[in-house]
Amino acid sequence: MTEQVIIIGAGQAGLSTAYYLKRNGIDPLILDANPTHGGAWLHAWDSLRLFSPKEYSSLSGFMMPKTREAYPSRDEVIDYFGKYEQRYQFRIERPVKVLDVTKVEDTFHITTDNGEFLAKAVVSATGNFSGQFIPTFPGLERFIGDQVHSADYKNNTIFSGKNVAVIGSGNSGSQILAEVSQIANTHWFTNHPLDYLDDELDGRYLFELSTKRYYAAMKGEKLENTDDFSKIVMVDSVKEARERGVLIREEDIESFSEHEIITANKRIAIDAIIWCTGFKTQLNHLKGLQLNTDLQSLTQGTRSTQHSGLWLIGYGEWSGYASATIIGVQKHARETARQIAESFELIAS
């Protein structure tokens, strides 16, 4: 059987696109590598909370139910995704890992660990979680302490009493540092000076700023003063860490030894490293399509510039402003579904 549309991934981008496709009369099949609902949120650390209230953290059509606190927790997001799937009765097969996608004439052949699937259109919505990025430093291969990427960090328990280097800024770096510093001696290394949003601002402000940038770009204009996008959001845990005086940036890393990080002026004993250095887009599951390596030219909006019938959504700025966020991906999912529906109408005619 050849499906009209197959969506790869059942995170926020995949579910949002499925919702809008169903509104356009198309019932897509979703292939999800995870064993259950939740997308990348299944892999987030235990204490993670969104920094926007549920009104700014909901998928289209169904508001997130009331949460225990102002900002939804990781577990509440996972539970909400499950309710969303049930509400709209999406067809989802899991766990199914996509190994490759090829195209023969006008049909996509999707090779998985559970057989082959065929589709006339494919939406890749796998996110960036599998592309964990760790930078290189002189001597890093000599370091013999524990290392974990933020994608694999769960809680602070195993770091009790240790000297821990948190490498990387952003919201993951600040929040993990805040948690680990409660029971460990932490050192924070970032590649630029630390900068924070005002205490009263949260994700709502960033969404509104992103929306302004989106509409400015639609008009061919450029929104000035976008530095706030890179600033750290002052959630309660980070405010508390500030009060304890642990939000201190160390000197730049020059090299590593077996047990130390070496800077220009000191050697710092380190037992463990937590890498909060983000993710790189990983599209190995599409290798058979031989996509461009330049992400900026890979899509026009979310539509592939190389293959008709292929869309990529939710990977970050190159696939749409704020498209890696729950609320930000909605407008891109709506447009993606519209384009797909339109393509089938054109084929039918």
Positions of predicted regions on the chain:
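Redox-cofactor-proximal catalytic regions of oxidoreductases
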Residues: 36-44, 48-61
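A short small-residue
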Residues: 59-63, 314-316
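Flavin (primarily FAD) cofactor-binding/catalytic cores of flavoenzymes
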Residues: 2-10, 15-34, 38-40, 69-171, ...
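A short acidic, helix-capping loop that chelates divalent metal ions and anchors anionic groups
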Residues: 63-69
